[in-house]
Every structure is written in C-alpha cells, then in structure tokens.
Amino acid sequence: LTTKKNQEEAKVNETSNELASATSAAQEAKENKEKADKAVETLNKQISAIKNLTIPQLPQNVIDAYKAYLADDSDANKTALNDIIQKWFKNSKYDFGTAITEYSPEHQNIVIKDWSNKDIVLPIDDSEVDLDNLTDKQIEALSQYYALLSNNLQEQVWGSHHYIVTEEAVQGVKNIAKAYAEENKPYSSGHSYTALAKDGLDSIAWAGENMNFNNTLLGYGAYYSEAKETRKVRMSQLYREVYDSVISFITNDVHANFGHMKLMVGEKVPTNVRAVGVANSFTASNVGRMHFVEFKGRNAHFEYVKDEQTGDYHSKYVDDYYDTGIAKPLATPFDTSKMEDELTAAKAKQTTAN
C-alpha cells in the first residue's frame, strides 16, 4: 500500500513538474515574442524617422536675399532678408507652431503636452541622457545630426558643403561644454573664451561657436521642466534642441547681424573641410546651452608662397590637421543600412518566436 501511495505521489509530482515546466516555457516564449515584436517596431520607427527626417529647405528668395546681404550688409538688405525669412518660416511645415499645454496636479504647474504642428520628423531615441555627463556616443550623435542639417543648408545655398564630425571634435566640444557648466554663469554672459580654450587637445582649437539656450528643455521659463528636477532627459529631447537651434540661427538672427547663420551656412562656397562638434552644457543653476563648435588645427596659419612663374607672393592657408589627413570623418548614424540589417535579424527572431 505504501509503495502504491509513493508511486501515485511521484506521478503527481512528475505531472506538476511537467505543468510548471510547460507554463515556464510558455511564459518565456511569450516574453521572447514581446521582445522580438518590440525590437521590430522600434527599428521600423527609427528607420522611417531617418528616411523622413525634416530638413529645412530654403526657398530661392531667401537664398538670394542672404547672398545680397553678404555682398552688401546695409540695414536695408538686413531688414529685407529678415522679412523674407519670417514670411517663409511662420506657420510653415518647419515651424513647430504653438505649444499645447495642460495643468498638471502632480507637478502643480503647466506642462507642454505637444505642439500644433505634429508633422515635423526628428530622430527617435528614448535612451536616457545625464545632462551632467553626456557620453561620447551621445555627443557624436548630436554632432552628426547638426552636420546633416547644416550641410544640407550649405548645399542649398552654395552647391557644396564642408562639415565633418571627427573624434577630436567630439572630445573637444565635450571638454568645452564641461568648462561652460563649471563656470556656472548666466546665459547673458555670452560666449566664454576661457571655456572655449579648454578643449583639452593638442591637435585642434576652436575656430567659431554658435550657441543657443535650451528653451524647450527648460519650459521657456514658464512651464514645468523635468530637466530642472532630475537633470536627465531623453536623447530625442536633445535632438529637438539641435533642430530648434538650427531654425533659430536663421529665423531669430537679425539682432546678431545674421552672424549665427553665417557660421552655419557659410559666407562663400566651401573649400576647406571643417570638423564640428555639438554638446549640451547644464550648469548647477539650471542654465542649459547647446554648443556648436567649429574646429581648426592647433597650428593652422597663413604662409606667404612665391609664385615661380610671376615671382609674386600670395598667402596660403595651411592646416596640418586637415591637410595631412589627421582629421578622419566618423561614419554617420543617419545611414540606415546598419539598422536595416538589424531589422532583418530582428524579424528572423520574431518569426522564430511566433
């Protein structure tokens, strides 16, 4: 009787174990399918976003007015350029429009929920960014996005472009942004030549800087800002700051005699390649700046060269960082081929999970 009872208990235990094992396998299969579905969905969204990125297209009358102002920077030409830019941009497909807001009992403040123009496509990346410690990869991605936008604008105006992103530019702008943050000065203090000198590298030096306040990130000074509370944001939010800055350098630059537009778009047909780096700085006092720094070789200089045929001397710009191939362009993340390979692999996993 005891033996029979033990046999029955063993059979019950075996059945229970089989059931538990089957349940566990089913749960694991369900989780694997959910992961595979999520991976495919995310990659599809990212690829679509890159292929459909919103890149401002300047109409011919803006280009003509810009070149006219470069040729003759009279007040009349400056006003004419600004008027044409405002007419082009306001309520255009490149204008985010009006903030859609609502009151948040949780934050006891008004929060921005969306924007009236929902058709602008920016890069999608929900990964977290520590505003006090942007990684090299995050800085590289911001730099590449800016290079993509500004090179497109240069192509529209001049028919060629000159921005590249290099490892040195990424490190240089990272150190410069850190120096700005440590200075902890108000935005009104303007460009800091002390911070700009702290690139920390022997090979390069800053040649020009555009800068913009983190308006959207910091709630335009009137709305709730999660960045102020947590000092953390999503990468997509920093892409928005880059886009807003590019637009601002065109549409909100009359007060600076279009100096920001000149640095970004150029004042003549580009002939020399230039490395550019983009990083955000965030001070202890919650002042956020996006920095766009153009770099030259540390020892760049002009030399007087004799023309052997005429005997005349003329100046020649020499920059070993670019001329000798030290500056090596980093591959852009806005090429979807790698993502498409990842999507193929993700779809294979999805099929297996099904």
Where are these regions (language model features)?
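Low-complexity, Gly/Ser/Thr/Pro-rich intrinsically disordered linker/tail segments
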Residues: R289-A353
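A well-ordered secondary-structure block
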Residues: A195-V305
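Extended hydrophobic/Leu-rich segments
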Residues: I47-I50, I55-L58, V62-Y69, N77, ...
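Long, non-membrane, amphipathic alpha-helices that form coiled-coils
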Residues: L1-I55, P329-N354
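Surface-exposed intrinsically disordered loops and tails
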Residues: L70-K78, N109-D132, L217-D244, F302-A331
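Short, well-ordered surface patches within globular domains
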Residues: P56-A207, M261, E267-G288
